Design a protein with these regions (language model features):
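Short linear sequence signals and composition-biased patches located at protein termini or domain-edge surfaces
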Residues: 2-36, 120-259
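Autoprocessing Asn-cyclization modules and mimics
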Residues: 12-129
Length: 259
């Protein structure tokens, strides 16, 4: 059978996505490390590469796709070696055509050919999978409709208390690459979400569970708590503060209010 797609998370975890569809926003309530008895949250965000200006990968249809979907040949009108940010091993490529879309993990790049080898670190390259695989967007005879490719990024945020327990930090992880520190001395990360379903429009929920879905998320409510680097000489304790904010999200689904 098909392997579950691995979900990037904190070091030492082996999370998987709940379905073959990776949403634009993937809540991860209580999947982060525990701090002072409080489980923290993680989040995975999927978005298209919008920073490639000279030769966007989706400017022209692909020149060819291997019959089993294991590789693609990019049009010479999109020279890979002249991209602002060249395609590399570990990138994620979305293939789209009239049959649907699928996400693949780059295992090799040679000339204009991008390869999606088996047994990739995220289990994305499974041409034999019954759903969500590259063969599902083919014609069934080894050929494919006109197909475009686009690089996408899967960004994961979580807290890390292991690298230096004295300096807990916020980590940003791109695809399956190692995480990088983006902020220091943060002790708590909590997320909730406002949904638009056209019926009850739930607010401040920790996850979008059935009958709702992550595609209905319209707003993320974020709480970050941090402390000072040194203890206060008077109180002998750290100074702690919390920041709350909201981030509005667009274009995750469409509801016709005039129907």
């Amino acid at each position: 059978g098909a392997k579950e797609v691995l979900r990037p998370g904190p070091p030492g975890t082996s999370y998987t996505f709940d379905s073959e569809t990776i949403a634009a926003v993937n809540p991860g309530p209580m999947l982060g490390p525990v701090w002072n008895g409080q489980p923290t949250d993680i989040i995975n965000i999927l978005y298209a590469d919008n920073a490639e200006f000279s030769h966007p990968l989706n400017d022209h249809p692909l020149a060819a796709i291997a019959a089993n979907g294991s590789s693609i040949t990019v049009s010479n009108l999109t020279p890979l070696n002249r991209m602002d940010n060249p395609i590399r091993v570990g990138d994620l490529i979305a293939l789209s055509n009239a049959k649907g879309s699928t996400l693949q993990y780059v295992t090799d790049v040679s000339g204009q050919t991008i390869t999606f080898g088996a047994n990739d670190p995220m289990n994305l390259n499974q041409p034999g999978a019954p759903a969500g695989s590259v063969t599902q967007i083919g014609n069934g005879d080894g050929t494919f409709p006109t197909t475009t490719a686009m690089r996408v990024y899967l960004i994961t945020y979580y807290l890390d208390f292991n690298e230096d327990p004295e300096t807990p930090r916020l980590i940003r992880r791109i695809n399956n690459d190692p995480g990088r520190t983006v902020a220091l001395i943060l002790e708590n990360l909590q997320l909730s979400y406002d949904l638009v379903d056209g019926v009850t429009n739930p607010t401040a929920v920790k996850n979008a569970v059935s009958p709702n879905s992550p595609s209905q998320i319209r707003k993320a409510n974020i709480l970050l708590s941090g402390r000072s680097a040194a203890k206060n000489r008077t109180t002998g304790d750290f100074l702690r503060r919390s920041l709350t904010t909201q981030v509005s999200l667009r274009s995750l689904s469409y509801i016709d209010r005039y129907e």
